[in-house]
């Protein structure tokens, strides 16, 4: 288990928890002074009232909650959202309403999930040629349905 420092930006904020022993992520809750409305085809930057610090070997990914996506057409717009190890500001979630009805978020509603994942840094080696593959440059549906 990796150590993550977490800071409540308000004493009324509740900390995220794993809901089951097999859960990969923890639900993040909205921290709001009053309910907000996300209209269809609109987004909103939802505050959580939390900030964190963790090792540079990791990132926190912000992902949609499957229930909100399946039942209400609400998703995290930049899925997965990345929280870098050197970011110390408030964690905020860009929610988007793909549905046809207004979506209301109340204080402490669970709106997304966060997952701690390892980061493997890249080292580039510039080249004029890449190794051939059977697929080649085919993309965007080139392998069939």
Predicted regions and their residues:
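DUTPase catalytic domain/fold
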Residues: 1-145
């Amino acid at each position: 288990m990796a150590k993550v420092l977490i800071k409540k930006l308000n004493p009324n904020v509740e900390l995220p928890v794993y809901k089951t022993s097999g859960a990969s992520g923890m639900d993040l809750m909205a921290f709001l002074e009053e309910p907000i409305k996300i209209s269809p085809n609109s987004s909103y930057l939802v505050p959580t009232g939390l900030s964190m610090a963790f090792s540079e070997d990791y990132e926190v990914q912000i992902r949609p909650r499957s229930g909100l996506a399946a039942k209400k057409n609400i998703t995290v717009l930049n899925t997965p959202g990345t929280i870098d190890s050197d970011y110390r500001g408030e964690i905020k979630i860009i929610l988007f309403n793909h549905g046809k009805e207004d979506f209301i978020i109340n204080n402490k509603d669970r709106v997304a999930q966060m997952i701690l994942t390892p980061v493997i840094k890249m080292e580039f080696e510039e080249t004029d040629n890449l190794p051939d593959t059977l697929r080649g440059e085919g993309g965007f549906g080139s392998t069939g349905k």
